[in-house]
Amino acid sequence: MFREPRASVDTVAASAADDNRGFDHYHHTMNEPATQVPALDTARLQLRCLKIEDTTAVHRVYGDPEAMRYWDMPPSIDLKETERRLARALSVDPQWHATWTVWTRRDGQLADDQFIGMVNYHARQPWNRRLALGWILIPSFQGRGYMQEAVRVVLAHCFTTLNTHRVEAEIEPENVRSARLAQRLGFQREGLLRDRLFVADQPRTQQMYGLLRSDWGG
């Protein structure tokens, strides 16, 4: 499940206050160096930090009902709505939520028509060394191993640069492709989250997948 950010830092702070590590740990993380969202390269892909200029490219997934089937919001009705969603995502400090756009390489060059999807981390809790991952792919690019390649390099960034101990993925039972991808990367299915969220006023159940740094094969 790809997640769009909705919570402000104030909401995160309230959540931190409820955590058993308390507000002191929240304020400690606020004094850490600013979180960076670097470009990440693989053999076939480049992952770049999301920017507002990506609106037209991103609309290829945000405006596609098939691509958005397992997303936590309905498809964008037009380009303007996609732009608003990107602006909202970009307003969140990358300490909590960050998104990469995924591009294929062609003769070492990148172009708008080579955009294939996105990967993000969200719900990050630095004091618990935990975050969640989401990904979304243009359907015509499925079955080529692109998203596994993209998620793998993001996992490497999370476990090393961000010093994450646990990564979670919340996947609907019907989303068989994403479940298989998570399992290929080493995630373990840990439980069922019944009616965990509502999309278009309909409840959705998710399965929780978890990957510990000690389980990760790199």
Regions found by a protein language model. Give the residues of each.
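GNAT-family acyltransferases
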Residues: V9-V12, N20-S140, H157, T161, ...
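Conserved catalytic-core motifs of GNAT/GCN5-like acyltransferases
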Residues: A123, E168-E170, Q188-Q206
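Cationic, low-complexity basic patches in intrinsically disordered or flexible, solvent-exposed regions
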Residues: P5
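Membrane-interacting alpha-helical segments
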Residues: F115, V119, I171-L181
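Conserved acetyl-CoA-binding loop-helix of GNAT-fold acetyltransferases
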Residues: W135-L137, G143-T160, V176-R184
